[in-house]
């Protein structure tokens, strides 16, 4: 069992139950999935760029990413239908908790000029989105072998009904929010 998963079961769930006055343990908000998405617009011109992006995202997530294809042609962006434009990974279960642990304890402190993550990136339904500007903050990526700096979006999906419940859950997982 992952360290954060054990922390959730033993300490965090009872704390949230007391804080929000839940009557059943099934009402306690929990993590459903974490989705990592990397848009690779340079892949339109050079196909090898997509291979590097898939490799980087695979190292970060610990599982093989799915290449996302364009749904329709957009002439302004020089994109054809069914052309590779990005890659994504959905993490659940133990891998999700392991990634979250590495992200909060190792990757976030390596961000330059880091002062905490925004408390305004909630979507109103109990989910949270974080944009990472450089993939090199993750220890799995070797700086010397990186061909280009790419960002990625991290979407954390929870069963929380409100943003307040989601923020309490993520704060319990030691997310460093500003203020």
Swiss-Prot record:
The keyword rRNA-binding applies. GO terms for cellular component: ribonucleoprotein complex; ribosome. Keywords: Ribonucleoprotein, Ribosomal protein, RNA-binding, rRNA-binding, tRNA-binding. PROSITE patterns: RIBOSOMAL_L5. It holds the Pfam family Ribosomal_L5_C. GO terms for biological process: translation. SUPFAM superfamilies: RL5-like (SSF55282). GO terms for molecular function: rRNA binding; structural constituent of ribosome; tRNA binding. Part of the 50S ribosomal subunit; part of the 5S rRNA/L5/L18/L25 subcomplex. Contacts the 5S rRNA and the P site tRNA. Forms a bridge to the 30S subunit in the 70S ribosome. Belongs to the universal ribosomal protein uL5 family. This is one of the proteins that bind and probably mediate the attachment of the 5S RNA into the large ribosomal subunit, where it forms part of the central protuberance. In the 70S ribosome it contacts protein S13 of the 30S subunit (bridge B1b), connecting the 2 subunits; this bridge is implicated in subunit movement. Contacts the P site tRNA; the 5S rRNA and some of its associated proteins might help stabilize positioning of ribosome-bound tRNAs. This is Large ribosomal subunit protein uL5. It comes from Albidiferax ferrireducens (strain ATCC BAA-621 / DSM 15236 / T118) (Rhodoferax ferrireducens). The gene is rplE.
């Amino acid at each position: 069992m992952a360290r954060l998963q054990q922390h959730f079961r033993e300490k965090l769930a009872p704390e949230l139950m007391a804080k929000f006055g839940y009557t059943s343990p099934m009402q306690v908000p929990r993590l459903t999935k974490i989705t990592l998405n990397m848009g690779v617009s340079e892949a339109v011109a050079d196909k090898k760029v997509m291979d590097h992006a898939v490799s980087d995202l695979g190292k970060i997530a610990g599982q093989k990413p799915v290449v996302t294809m364009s749904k329709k042609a957009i002439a302004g962006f020089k994109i054809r239908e069914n052309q590779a434009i990005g890659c994504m990974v959905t993490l659940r279960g133990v891998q999700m908790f392991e990634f979250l642990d590495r992200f909060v304890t190792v990757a976030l402190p390596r961000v330059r000029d880091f002062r905490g993550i925004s408390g305004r990136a909630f979507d109103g339904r109990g989910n949270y989105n974080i944009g990472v500007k450089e993939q090199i903050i993750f220890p799995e990526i070797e700086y010397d072998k990186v061909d280009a700096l790419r960002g990625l979006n991290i979407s954390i999906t929870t069963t929380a009904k409100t943003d307040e419940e989601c923020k309490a859950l993520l704060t319990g997982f030691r997310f460093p929010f500003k203020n």
